[in-house]
Amino acid sequence: GTPCGESCVWIPCISSAVGCSCKNKVCYKN
């Protein structure tokens, strides 16, 4: 549930490498 400081409107989360995932056009970790 922690914002990763990245949006995923046009491209996937680069921060998915550290466990972030796309939710509501923003990348979150848990």
Swiss-Prot record:
- Specify whether Disulfide bond is a keyword of the entry: yes
List the cysteine pairs that form cystine: C4-C20, C8-C22, C13-C27
Can you locate the Cyclopeptide (Gly-Asn) cross-link? Answer: G1-N30
- Pfam families named in the record: Cyclotide
Q: Which PROSITE patterns match?
A: CYCLOTIDE (PS51052), CYCLOTIDE_BRACELET (PS60008)
Keyword check for Transferase, yes or no: no
GO BP term, example: defense response
Q: Which InterPro entries match?
A: Cyclotide, Cyclotide_bracelet_CS, Cyclotide_sf
Signal peptide coordinates: none
SUPFAM superfamilies xref list: Cyclotides (SSF57038)
> Which UniProt keywords are listed?
Disulfide bond, Knottin, Plant defense
Tell me its family: Belongs to the cyclotide family. Bracelet subfamily.
What is this protein for, i.e. what is its function?
Answer: Probably participates in a plant defense mechanism.
Q: What is known of its domains?
A: The presence of a 'disulfide through disulfide knot' structurally defines this protein as a knottin.
Name of the featured protein? Cycloviolacin-O5
Lineage of the native species? Eukaryota, Viridiplantae, Streptophyta, Embryophyta, Tracheophyta
